[in-house]
């Protein structure tokens, strides 16, 4: 599985209830960690919480819902963003659970990146000429894989001890 919408909802619920928890995850979680093929709602809510937190604004469910509505996105099943955000605030979220949930969510994001890398490698392998050297073939695959995956090892936003 490459996404978990329940984890996304749990993280958003935690941030709505405890916006100070954003500081714990801001160095390794961003909007791209939210699966948005079905609906951009969760990533949009996260981005608005992120903007409010970074701007020193209060994170209030009414204000967040208003800002989501102002974005003007259409959501599947005619979902009302205000009702959805209200449902998030009603979720039970254990105290101090934001960091743990964010680390679990990051695992899904990494899986999606690995999947995308493998798809890009497959495309590249199909386009390499038959007379290409072994070295060229391997280096082509390596460059695609490493350009995405090394981010998690070496990048400034790499989470610490994600698998603990």
Model-derived regions: residue spans:
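Noncatalytic partner-interaction/assembly domains of nucleic-acid and motor enzyme complexes
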Residues: 1-108
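Sparse recognition of residues in long alpha-helices and their boundaries
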Residues: 27, 61, 117-118, 130, ...
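The Walker A/P-loop phosphate-binding site
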Residues: 13, 154-164
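A sequence-level detector of short, solvent-exposed, charge-rich linear segments
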Residues: 30, 64, 68, 120-124, ...
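Non-catalytic interaction/clamp surfaces of large macromolecular machines
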Residues: 114-119, 123-153
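Generic detector of ordered secondary-structure context
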Residues: 3, 93, 106, 133, ...
């Amino acid at each position: 599985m490459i996404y978990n919408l329940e984890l996304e909802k749990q993280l958003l619920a935690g941030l709505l209830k405890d916006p100070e928890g954003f500081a714990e995850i801001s160095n390794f979680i961003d909007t791209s960690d939210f699966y948005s093929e079905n609906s951009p709602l969760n990533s949009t809510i996260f981005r608005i919480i992120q903007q409010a937190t970074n701007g020193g604004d209060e994170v209030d469910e009414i204000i967040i819902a208003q800002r989501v509505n102002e974005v003007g996105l259409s959501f599947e099943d005619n979902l009302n963003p205000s009702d959805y955000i209200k449902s998030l605030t009603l979720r039970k979220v254990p105290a101090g659970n934001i960091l743990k949930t964010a680390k679990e969510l990051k695992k899904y994001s990494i899986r999606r990146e690995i999947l995308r890398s493998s798809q890009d490698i497959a495309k590249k392998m199909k386009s390499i000429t038959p007379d290409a050297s072994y070295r060229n073939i391997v280096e082509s695959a390596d460059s695609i894989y490493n350009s995405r995956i090394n981010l998690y090892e070496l990048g400034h936003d790499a989470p610490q001890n994600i698998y603990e």
